[in-house]
Amino acid sequence: MDVLANLGKNLESIDLSLESPLNFRLAAVLVPIYVKSQKILLTKRTENLSHHQGQISFPGGRFDESDGNLVETALRETEEEVGIKRESIHVLGSLNPLLSTSMHYVYPLVAFINEDVELKINPEEVQETFFADIKQLLLPENNLSGMFNDQEYMYYSVVNYKIWGLTHLILTDLLTRLKK
């Protein structure tokens, strides 16, 4: 079964207004999906970054005025972090924007990636990359809860990684839309 068949019609149109609530800084991440293998590319951030060190994330980052719009932000950051050139990326639409704990209003943009693209990791920002199988993510037994700093968090357990926080919320939004 092709879980990606109806994805495009279940996404939001991309908001290019560059508006942010509460003066949060704007940011965009790319949710890169490999269509044939039905996998999502994720990164593990390096420990030397100023925010979210060592966490699992999508390629992306802060909006820069020279970007012009958030699609360009996501494309620029994806190329900087994992070396995927814009010609290999087909942006489909957006998921719901989210407020992050680091005071960013983050727009997750969903894109299909050419299967044969070669990753070129930026070691300053990305410690490693891995792929999450969409069909595995859809299994209820991979969406778990656990305690961290005396708080309960939901997370996905994938390839020996715990995917929690903003990345978990983005994946949950995506997976909910895939089930429609």
State where each predicted segment sits.
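Amphipathic alpha-helical blocks and their helix-capping loop/short-beta junctions
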Residues: 124, 129-148
